[in-house]
From Swiss-Prot:
Name of protein: Bifunctional riboflavin kinase/FMN adenylyltransferase
Domain of life, source organism: Bacteria
SMART domains membership: Flavokinase
Top-level EC class as recorded in UniProt: transferase
Function in brief: Catalyzes the phosphorylation of riboflavin to FMN followed by the adenylation of FMN to FAD.
Family: Belongs to the RibF family.
Catalytic reaction annotation: riboflavin + ATP = FMN + ADP + H(+); FMN + ATP + H(+) = FAD + diphosphate
InterPro entries, A to Z: FAD_synthase (IPR015864), Riboflavin_kinase (IPR023468), Riboflavin_kinase_bac (IPR002606), Riboflavin_kinase_bac/euk (IPR015865), Riboflavin_kinase_dom_sf (IPR023465), Rossmann-like_a/b/a_fold (IPR014729)
Pfam family, one: Flavokinase
One Gene Ontology molecular-function label: ATP binding
EC number, as in UniProt: 2.7.1.26, 2.7.7.2
The encoding gene: ribF
Any one GO BP annotation for this protein: FMN biosynthetic process
Length: 284
C-alpha cells in the first residue's frame, strides 16, 4: 500500500517527481543492539525488487547517533526537506520517527503541512486477526511455517546468491547440488528441506528444485549451507546468480545413520517435491 501510493502520486504528476524509497543503513535494531539484524530482503535484493515495480531511487540514510538524536521536527526539516527535497511521503499507520520514536503519523502530517509536504497514511494490512508485520513473517519462517510466511508476504520467500564450489557430496550420491552463497545478513528460514523454483538468468522459465538448508549433520558439517538440487535439469552453474523461491517445507533437518540412508531420503524428498510442484514425467 505504501509503495502503491508513491507510484500513484508519481503518475498523477506525470513523473515530474522521482518515486523513491528511503531506508536506514545499518538497520536501527543493529545499531542499538550492536548485532547484525538478519533481513528478509538484504539491500541488493531490495533494490532489485523496487526497480522491478518502478521505484527509481533507493536512498540509504547512514544511521548514526547524530541521526538517532534528531527530534521529529529536526528529522523532517534536515533530512526530508533540506536533503531529500521531498514533496510527497507515504508511511504506514504505525510509523514512528525522531529521537526515541517520539513522532507519530499525526506529527508527520502536521509537520508536512508546515513544510509543504503531502503526507499519505497507509492503513495496516491484516490477515485473520493480526496485522501483517516483518516480525510476524520472521517468526513464521524460523518456525518452519513457510505457507504462513508466504501468505503474509504475498509471494514465496526467496533466497538470492551466487553458486560457489562445494564438497560435491551431492554429486557422489547421485543428486548434484548448487551451493548457494547467501548475503551475510539474509534471514535463514528454519533448517530443513524445501521444494521450490529456481530462477536462472540464462533461462526464461523457472526450474523446479529441492533445497536443503542447514549444517548437514550426517556429514558433520560445521557451517550452514544452502544446497539446491535442480529437478529435470543439469548444467554448470558455478559463478552464476540464482534466485530460489521456497514454496513448500518438506521436513526438518535430520542426522542419518549413514550416507545410504541419506541417499534414500533425498530420493523420497525429490519424489515428494515432484508431486507438490505438479511436475510431469520422471525425475532424472
Amino acid at each position: 500500500m505504501v509503495l502503491r501510493q508513491v507510484m500513484d502520486f508519481a503518475q498523477a504528476v506525470e513523473h515530474l517527481l522521482h518515486p523513491a524509497v528511503v531506508s536506514f543503513n545499518p538497520h536501527p535494531r543493529s545499531f542499538f543492539s550492536g548485532r547484525t539484524q538478519p533481513l528478509l530482503t538484504p539491500l541488493p535484493e531490495k533494490a532489485a525488487q523496487l526497480t522491478a515495480i518502478g521505484i527509481e531511487q533507493l536512498v540509504l540514510l547512514p544511521f548514526t547517533e547524530k541521526l538517532a538524536n534528531l527530534s521529529p521536527k529536526q528529522f523532517v526539516q534536515s533530512i526530508l526537506v533540506e536533503q531529500l527535497q521531498a514533496k510527497f511521503i507515504s508511511v504506514g499507520q504505525d510509523f514512528c520517527f525522531g529521537h526515541q520514536r517520539r513522532g507519530n503519523v499525526q506529527d508527520l502530517q502536521n509537520l508536512g503541512q508546515e513544510f509543504g509536504i503531502t503526507v499519505a497514511i497507509a492503513q495496516l494490512e491484516q490477515t485473520d486477526t493480526e496485522r501483517i508485520s516483518s516480525s510476524r513473517i520472521r517468526r513464521a519462517l524460523k518456525e518452519g511455517k513457510l505457507a504462513m510466511a508466504n501468505h503474509l508476504l504475498g509471494r514465496p520467500y526467496a533466497l538470492r546468491g551466487t553458486v560457489v564450489q562445494g564438497q560435491q557430496l551431492g554429486r557422489k550420491l547421485g543428486f548434484p547440488t548448487a551451493n548457494l552463497c547467501l548475503p551475510a545478513d539474509k534471514l535463514w528460514p528454519k533448517y530443513g528441506v524445501y521444494a521450490g523454483w529456481v530462477n536462472l538468468n540464462a533461462l526464461d522459465v523457472p526450474i523446479p528444485a529441492v533445497i536443503n538448508l542447514g549444517d548437514r549433520p550426517t556429514v558433520n558439517g560445521q557451517e550452514p549451507s544452502a544446497e539446491v538440487h535442480l529437478l529435470q535439469w543439469s548444467g554448470d552453474l558455478y559463478g552464476q546468480g540464482l534466485e530460489v523461491a521456497l514454496t513448500h517445507y518438506l521436513r526438518p533437518e535430520t542426522k542419518f545413520a549413514g550416507l545410504d540412508q541419506l541417499k534414500n531420503q533425498i530420493a523420497q524428498d525429490c519424489q515428494q517435491a515432484e508431486k507438490l510442484l505438479n511436475l510431469d514425467g520422471a525425475i532424472p
